[in-house]
C-alpha cells in the first residue's frame, strides 16, 4: 500500500488488521510504502501486525518541499515525525529500503547516507529520526527481500542463497 499522510497510514493499518482477523492463517506479507507522516500511536502497530515499513529515505531532507510545501500546513508534532525511521525501528518495525524510482534515484548508497544524516539544502530534517547505516544495510538487503517475499532466496550472505556481490574501495560504515 502507498501511504504518505498519517490518516492514510492509520487506515492502511486498520485494513491490514481487518485482513489478518479475517484470514488468520494467511502468510501474505503486508507493507506500507512512503510513510512520510506517521502518528506515533501507530508505531507499535507495524510490529504487532507484521507490516513492513517500506521507506524511501532519500526524501528525508530539509528542502523546499518539506520546509515550504509541508511544514506550514501540518502541526509541529506531525512535522517532527516526517519519515520516522528511528521511531519505527525502535518500536520493532521491520524497515525495508526502497527507491521512489523513476521520481528519484534508485541508488541505495544515496538513500543510506541520507537516512543517517537527513541533511539537505535547508538544514537537517528531524535529526532524531536518523537511523544508523547498519540498520539501513539490513533495510536494503534482508528486509527488502522480506518485503518481496524472497527472503528464502536472497537477502543476507548465507549458504544456499543467491547473491550479487560488489567490491568497495572504502569502509561504508565510516564514510
Predicted region positions:
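Short, internal active-site loops enriched in acidic
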Residues: 5-8, 37
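His/Asp/Glu-enriched, well-ordered alpha-helical/loop segment
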Residues: 7-30, 44, 55-174
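Aromatic- and carboxylate-enriched substrate-binding clefts and catalytic-loop regions
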Residues: 28-39
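Short amphipathic alpha-helices and their capping/turn segments at secondary-structure boundaries
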Residues: 38-52
Amino acid at each position: 500500500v502507498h501511504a504518505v499522510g498519517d490518516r492514510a497510514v492509520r487506515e492502511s493499518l486498520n485494513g491490514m488488521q481487518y485482513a489478518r482477523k479475517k484470514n488468520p492463517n494467511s502468510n501474505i506479507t503486508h507493507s506500507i510504502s512512503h510513510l512520510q507522516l506517521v502518528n506515533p500511536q501507530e508505531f507499535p502497530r507495524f510490529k504487532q501486525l507484521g507490516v513492513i515499513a517500506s521507506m524511501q529515505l532519500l526524501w528525508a531532507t530539509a528542502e523546499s518541499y518539506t520546509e515550504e510545501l509541508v511544514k506550514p500546513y501540518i502541526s509541529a508534532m506531525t512535522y517532527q515525525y516526517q519519515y520516522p525511521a528511528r521511531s519505527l525501528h525502535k518500536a520493532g518495525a521491520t524497515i525495508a529500503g526502497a527507491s521512489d524510482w523513476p521520481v528519484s534515484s534508485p541508488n541505495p548508497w544515496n538513500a543510506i547516507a541520507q537516512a543517517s544524516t537527513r541533511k539537505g539544502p535547508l538544514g537537517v530534517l528531524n535529526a532524531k529520526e536518523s537511523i544508523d547505516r547498519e540498520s539501513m544495510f539490513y533495510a536494503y538487503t534482508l528486509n527488502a527481500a522480506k518485503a518481496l517475499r524472497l527472503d528464502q532466496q536472497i537477502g543476507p550472505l548465507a549458504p544456499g542463497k543467491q547473491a550479487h556481490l560488489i567490491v568497495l574501495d572504502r569502509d561504508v560504515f565510516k564514510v
